Structure formats: C-alpha cells, structure tokens
Amino acid sequence: MAGVSPVVNHPYTTNSGDFIELGMEPAQKVQVDLDEAFNQMLHDGKVEEVVEAINGSPDLLSESDVENAKNNEHTYDIDNKNFNFEPKNSVNKTETIREELDQAASKILIETLDLHQKEGFEETIVTEEATDAVDLEAKGTTHGENDLDEVPTELNELANEVVDVDDVVSPSSELNAQSVNNILPISDDPKDSTSEAETRDFNWLSKGIVIFPNSSECAFYGNNNDEGMYLYSNGDDLNENTIEDFFGLVRARLESLNLLDSDSELLCEFPDLSLKINEDNVYASQIHLVDILEILTVHCDLEESFSIVFSTQPRFIARYNELVQAVSSSSNSEIDEVEDAETIDSKILEKRNDLNNEEPNSVVAEDGSEIITLDENDQSPNEATEKLRDNDLEESLIKDENLEDVEDENVKLDNYNIDGSLNNADLSQEPITNDGENVDWEATSEDVLERGYESAFPESEGTINSSKRRLSVTTDTENIELSDELASAGTPKKSKLMPSDD
C-alpha cells in the first residue's frame, strides 16, 4: 500500500479490560488517482488550475478558481464549501450529465486515520476502502442545451470525488445528500477494523510466580496446576489497581486461610527489579500495578517468568503500641509497690499507737509489789523497764504534791470557819501565816479576802499544777517510746522471746 508508514506496536493498550497491541500510523492525505479518460477531459486551462489547487490542498479552493468555475447553477459540496454556478440558459439535461459523469468515474483510493482517546490510551483505526463506482445525484434545476458544453464536467466530477475525512471515519455520522455512496461501513470494534496490528492478551502475566512464606498452604493454585486461581484475569483492568489494592487481594486470601493476623503486615518484593514495599507504605496507594509491569517489560525478558515474593513482619503501629503498653504497666507496678510500702508504714504506726494505749499485764508478787509481764507483741524488756521507772517517778511526785496540799489545807482550815470567817476562838494566839509573817487581827475578813481567796484555799491551784506536771511527764515518756520504735523500725526485726545481744 503506497504511502502507509510502518506500524509501531504498543503493548499496554486495553479495550474493555483486554490488553491489545495497537498500530500507530501518521495521518495520510487524501489522494485522487485519475484514469486516462479523466486526463483526456482536462482541456480547459481554468479547470487545470482548479485541479492543481485541489491536489495541493483538498481542503481549500481559492476565490479566483471559484469565480472561474461558475458556469451553471448546480451546487456541489466540496469539503463543506459551496460553489454556485449560474448558467446563461436553463436547460434540463440531467440525463446527459449523469452519462458523462459515469464515463468519467475512476477508481478512488482513500486512506484515513482517526485517533480516538479512550480510557487514557490511543486506539488507531486504519481504514482501506476501494469503490468501484461513484453515483452522484445532481441537485438543482434544469440546464440549457446551449450552455451544456460550457459546463466543466471535470470540475463537477472533482467536486463530488473530494470526501470529508470525518464523514468516512465516523460511522455514526450521517452523510449528506451530496456525499459519496457505497462507502464500506467501519466497525466500532478495533479487532475487526485493524488488519495489520496483532492483538495480545498478555499471556505472559500467567507466568508470574507469587511466592509466599508457606507456598504449600497459601498458593493461589488448586490441585491441577493447569487450572489455577490467579490474582488477575485478562478481563481485569490493571490500570485502575494500585499496589494497595494488590495488597488487599493478597491479605483477603491469606486471612481466609487463617494465615495472617491484623498485627502483621505484608512485605512485597520484586526480585527482578530489587524493589520492596510494605503494606503500610504511603506510596502503595499512588503506584499502580501496571507501572510495575511496564518496568518489568523493559528490564526483563517476557519469555522468562517473573516473581513476586511476599513475606510478613510486625506492623510498626502494633509494635509501638505494645511497647507503650509495657512501659505503662511497669510504671503502674512501681506505683503499686510504693503504695504497698506506705500501707505497711501506716499499719506499723497504728500498731504502735495501739501498744501505747494498752495497759501492761501485771502480776502482784508475794511482798505486794506489782510485776509487769510481757507478751510476745509487747515492748522489749529495756522499753518496759524504762516505762516502769518513769511510772514510779511519776507516782512519787504525785504523792509528795498531795501531802503538801493536805498539810496546807489543814493549816488553813484551822484558822478559818467553813464560811470563810476567822476563827474567834483562836484570836488569843499569835496569828502566823504560811510564810511565818504576823497577821493583824484587827483586819477584817474583807481585807483577808482582798489578798486573795485562792491563797486561803490553795487546794485548787495545787491540783492544777500537779495535773500539769503529770501531763508533761507522760508526754515526755511517750516521745521517748515513739523515738525508740522509729529507730528500731529501720533495723531487721528480732524475736522478742530471745535475749538481745545488748
């Protein structure tokens, strides 16, 4: 075929999910092959100029050629351009024009190229049509016999032979009344319209080997290797599937076999390309599987099989959460240990308070003395002895204070009546106060009261003072016991039934 360039194959073009190999050709100009009969009719110089304009640019005619071609009132469609011819005389010779046009009919070879864009891929349709006859219907009114010889039949024929490219390529478009008839229809299916470009269904994809950690259990093949289950079939659209979708298919298969849990992620490796990508990689949703296959076609031989190796590893987020939980649990255990220690200390203090409040067990000896006995949970012998010594000292102090108070009270009562008045029976005696001073008996009882009623009745003051002394002694004793217990709390406990080393 003249003027047809060699076809360039592209293996990644699909139609309805099928992979095909397309032919790529540059656009060709419309060529008109004139036969000898047509050449003999080129006798008019003006017509030759029109023919040269058509051969140079079939889409454009100059205005001068149009003016020179106006010889009849017939209207012809030449590449969507109207040329009106106004004859001098109107004679109806339609049959004569039809006969002359039939004699001048020639064989026309039309080669067209239409590029269609479908789903991001180019589809090439190469059309080769041959017509044996061209039947044109003349439009218009009558022509005159005298002016029929002046009508350039060559121009009329050329005007009907030029066909719009869009009308030939697009099968769905309707040809107008002036279009060429008997044009072979063009199919929408590129397999039917493409003769030179061979189709390929990418059978080499079935040569891909998917290797899993345990291929015997999770292989994608049944008992018969010839009839296996594949991740993708020829009808699947690989252009729309990303690596993330590929991971999803593999995960669904492995989870159905109970071979993969949510704490593990898949790791996909292409050994032929030295590429690895994990399931949680952000680029997995941006790279399409067909991109990897295109790289394989360049770097690998299609006659050899390629492999995809899958493995598993702990997910980053799962392992991270596990470590955080371990650190949190260890911190909680340390807090629990501190709380347990504080609880033990509080229990020790409560026990000490209970021991301080308890009265020691006592036994009366034969001589009437009181002996304090110790239980297993009581204080040590040293502490008990010290406490007993403090108790004896306190009792002796209390006795002395009570004796002094009784003597003072007896002296006071001897000098005063019950109502506080001086005893008149003793006025002859020399009044002596507690301090040894002389008393003026002429002083009234009111003067005595002014000196202080408390000095006359000092028993209340002595009672208060003795109570203060007893309280101070008791407080000091408790402080000594508490300090001894705190000092012994930090040392290992010893059996209280065994004598100490001290």
Swiss-Prot record:
Compositionally biased region (Polar residues): 420-436, 462-477
Q: Where is the composition biased (Acidic residues)?
A: 367-378
Residues where Phosphoserine is found: S328, S330, S331
Q: Which UniProt keywords apply?
A: Cytoplasm, Meiosis, Nucleus, Phosphoprotein
Q: Which GO terms describe its cellular component?
A: cytoplasm; nucleus
* Region (Disordered), start-end ranges: 353-391, 420-440, 454-502
- Example GO biological process term? meiotic cell cycle
The highest taxon in the source lineage is Eukaryota
InterPro entries documented for this protein: UPF0646
Q: Cellular location of this protein?
A: Cytoplasm; Nucleus
Provide the family line: Belongs to the RMR1 family.
Name the job this protein performs. Answer: Required for normal levels of gene conversion events during meiosis.
Q: What is this protein called?
A: Reduced meiotic recombination protein C1442.04c
The organism named in the record is Schizosaccharomyces pombe (strain 972 / ATCC 24843) (Fission yeast)
Recall the taxonomic lineage recorded for the source organism: Eukaryota, Fungi, Dikarya, Ascomycota, Taphrinomycotina
